[in-house]
């Protein structure tokens, strides 16, 4: 279908010489406005669209009965997209909520849905306690939940899609007294709502202003709350202008739809790098304070305390985690490398204490890492995860490769890592996947394959380091699984360990895994892996914000000037932003050159600059008690992990992984060094 067919005659041209005007029929679009008198239930009025006599592109939206408002709507073509401009003028003081619904003409059951960074397909990988089709097939959400204020509907049958995007400068937000029901805002907000609804079997885009959420609002991890509808004041004589843009196009499949939608969002909102005062050297110097001030000694393992810390004091605890949110070994390697570059004997000594303790006491009887140990409780988690184990091997292979390049060898560590890689071969299923969780005796606890790409990285690194082709063959089998089960089905899920749902990390890890394979292959095989990398990368990109969410005065993140562009939403279940990126910016830089696509490189720079903003240091602690302990759970919408709400952090955080992620972001080309073997000097300006 084309734009004219979609709207059955919506005017798409303003001038005869541009595009021939056609008759507009209102059957495909409906509008309504709700007005609220304080202390009373709101009253909803449907709006009939009547074309103005002297302007075939403009309409008067007439209510079903008299209201103290004048509402007009103008349609215009914007480079093949339909721009909807709504003007609301108050004849008396009013509190209003305006909404429109656009029928796509698609059968709802034939469709998959998209709200970037929050909703993919039907969210059926998510639990019923989070937004998904398990609860309803129609959802409206506030725009700041999304990495772009956009909703898209893709018809698998028609191989067509329609999106609606809000166009605004998004400058205002206001604190509200309630989180459910009908609420009157105490000031101005820029946040509207967007979503999709099943209207008598037809997939419909719904959008409006100010925000509204239905059938539920999602206010806390695994907590659905009653619906909410906000009403904004419009004083007598005031006019408010609202703008949305409709795009429709063809797409071969859901992945192609996501690519189209991301490129459109990127071009529409044009995120620019964030101007921050911190150079790479500044960032690393401050974050190195975490390496010093979080070190825990006196147990069988020496480690940087990086999980479940309180933002209020950042006091170390006895919890040591090899990968995931602790990243003990990767932080030890980063500190080790930095110590040689900067002549920091303190860091060198501390890192070697970590390595020596894990070499002596950090392995189970079967040869796995003791990946999660709580010395405060005297407890060692008996369940292993392919993700933590893989991330531990990854860190130590970086250490061994760096040492080898500098003329130093560690034969005991080499043997431990070779043994672990051999163990991975035993864990791998016939389809190429790895179980998500398992015991020391190899019995499977969680057979989900969503974490499989985390194993690809150390397998390829192990192949390069030990010259053992079995590891490369195993890595290629993981890619076969990724292609068949995740990438080709556009179904990225369950990579993270603190949620079981659609998540950013699954697509990011898939892109990184196939990127590694493309680096060590040639010809058609190289191109195949590169194509898979690009396809997965678009999904990962869709989680990262291309716009700046507004905050209210009094919300700390807004008061210190946080720009959200370049930060990534986490998952459906965990609706906050964070700095999980690791090597992904390097993947984007590589893709940009590989496919001559400047958007990738430009957005990598947006990510790199934006994620420096919350560096805690003296005079600019950003709500964190200690310098260098980078924040984690950054709450940018009406949701929290358990405490504090929008504009603040959760009270507990894990700087172990945030510091490790930013360190890799600021050390570009890390995998290229140890796989394709150019020097680090050639990769860093």
For each predicted feature, which ranges?
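Beta-strand/loop-rich accessory regions of lumenal/periplasmic or secreted enzymes
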Residues: 24, 38-40, 59-66, 72-236
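Low-complexity, Ser/Thr/Pro/Gly-enriched N-terminal "stalk/linker" regions
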Residues: 25, 31, 37-42, 47-49, ...
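Aromatic-lined, polymer-binding surfaces characteristic
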Residues: 385-389, 446-456, 486-489, 497-511
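Well-ordered alpha-helical scaffold segments within catalytic/enzyme domains
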Residues: 329-345, 391-409, 454-469, 509-525, ...
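Residue-level detector of conserved catalytic or cofactor/ligand-binding positions
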Residues: 671-685
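Hydrophobic h-region of N-terminal signal peptides that target proteins for export
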Residues: 7-18
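Extended, well-ordered alpha-helical scaffold segments
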Residues: 257-294, 343-361, 405-425, 467-484, ...
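Glycine- and aromatic-rich loop/turn segments at beta-sheet edges
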Residues: 288-320, 360-382, 424-444, 483-501, ...
